[in-house]
Amino acid sequence: MKKILFFLILCSQFSFSQELALVKQNGKIGYLDKTGKLAIKPAYDKARGFSDGLAAVKDQTKWGFIDAKGKWVIPASFDDAEDFNSGLCVVEKDKKRFYINKKGEAVNTPPTEKYFSFENGVAFIRQAKKVGLINPKGEIVLQPKYDMIKPFEGGYARVKNNDRWGIIDKTGKAVVEPLYEEIGNYFKGVTWAKSGDAFGLIIGGKFKAIEGVDKIWDFHVQDNTYARKGGKIGFIDTKGSWIIEPKFDKARAFCKNLAPVYVGKKWGYVNTTGAFVVEPAYNDAEIFSEDGLAPVKEKDWGFIDVKGKMVIPTNYDISTAFSFLNSDAKGFISGVSRVKNNGKWGFLDTKGQLLGNQWFENAELFN
């Protein structure tokens, strides 16, 4: 059977509000809908995915914006363009970068050493090598004061000052002061951190060390995460208590109450009590998606369901090479996975059927 290269779509990171995916056919770019039909016929040399209802496309030498019907909303007049978010977009014209609104009008914002795209209602602003936040009205929400601010996740972002890390919310308020050598994602009021030589959790603003632990991974979608002690990995809850004692060589996060673990040179899946639901039999295994499928590898890759049944046979190659796939979750989302077959791209559903029975020269994520 021919191998298909899966570029796996994230469990929960992307919105499908437009239900359109960028595709390339006969050297031109268009957009595919979730029924497998070309909603916008391939006509562009370069283009970006839809965001905030608009997509940046290049018409000969200039960039402009179209809507989901392919109608020009902002004429092509820019030398470069990013994605709209919160009603604003970073563009470049005559070697100058600035924000525009959905009418194509320039928007006044405070001076910044670099223009950052908006995300979740805020954008970074950098002055005198310090980073702060602005809102879509161009108002400074947080005066530039940090050496670094990481992208927001779930309304919170990691911040760094003087080699110490903390966490802020979208208003710029520090929910965890920058006091720690390392810090994790903020999950339901809890995060992991390193204080001196100790690893532990910050609960209610107080650091609680977990004895013997030398690494903790970020929380995912369930109220637990995995941690390492004495060279073995187990799982802790949001209070820092072990729910599964350290006994695995490798592990990944829980989703659908199952987590991939590595023992005896094979991967299987355990439930939240530590009992195997899928016995260790695979050369590799990834986290379940919200669609209830997980990639597993024998010689090649396939997908199993939460009962361990092989839904898509292990006849495929998979890849997570994209740098923006910054999540533990890999697999299907909303019933679709982007795939590659004999140099052509398309989309499979959870039964392994090709969406619209069409292959393309390139295809990007639905958004």
Which ranges hold each PLM region?
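Bacterial Sec-dependent N-terminal signal peptides
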Residues: 1-19
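Residue-level detector of conserved, function-critical positions
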Residues: 18-367
